[in-house]
Amino acid sequence: MTDTLFGFNKSNVVLAAGVAGAAFLGYCIYFDHKRINAPDYKDKIRQKRRAQAGSGGMAARRPPAGGNEMAPDVTDPSQMQRFFLQEVQLGEELMAAGNVEEGAVHIANAVMLCGESQQLLSIFQQTLSEEQFRAVVQQLPSTRERLADMFGARADEAENEPPLVQYLGDGPPPAQIQELIDDTDDLE
């Protein structure tokens, strides 16, 4: 047996391949560093994300908010969890893209599906803007009906009480929140 490969010494071929690989890796690192440190890098990334959101980058994977979503099997906790997380993610993405109404529908779906809806609403009250949170609260009454239609009779067996909301703002709470507070006081 010979120590040649295509007429070259095997050790020289291995050495040349190693040097070529290291040179290519250095080339990649250099240009990635140059790209990231460009002064307009972050602006380009933001513009690209806005363009994707505006041109339908999300629309291909987003179900319509009008209640035509594919309903998961309510007896499968993993499907329900996946649906809940999807609703939260879609709601946040839509609101970040400026579509507050459709985002509020998805977040309201998530709130109604959550076992700890009061805590989730409290979190959203702290993380969303006042306008966005108000839109979510306005969607809650119709969300119960929409989910009942989506899931059938099993949705009626779920939590029948509206979520409690703790208003942390100055002055009296908005009318929608006051209605929810008044509804829960009837249970005592």
UniProtKB/Swiss-Prot annotation:
It is found in: Mitochondrion outer membrane. GO terms for cellular component: mitochondrial outer membrane translocase complex. Residues 32-188 are cytoplasmic. Residues 48-67, 155-188 are annotated as: Disordered. It comes from the Eukaryota. Keywords: Membrane, Mitochondrion, Mitochondrion outer membrane, Protein transport, Transmembrane, Transmembrane helix, Transport. It is a single-pass membrane protein. The chain crosses the membrane at residues 13-31. GO terms for biological process: intracellular protein transport; protein import into mitochondrial matrix; tRNA import into mitochondrion. Residues 1-12 are mitochondrial intermembrane. Residues 58-67 have a biased composition (Low complexity). The keyword Zinc does not apply. Belongs to the Tom20 family. Central component of the receptor complex responsible for the recognition and translocation of cytosolically synthesized mitochondrial preproteins. Together with TOM22 functions as the transit peptide receptor at the surface of the mitochondrion outer membrane and facilitates the movement of preproteins into the translocation pore. Forms part of the preprotein translocase complex of the outer mitochondrial membrane (TOM complex). This is Mitochondrial import receptor subunit TOM20 homolog. It comes from Caenorhabditis briggsae.
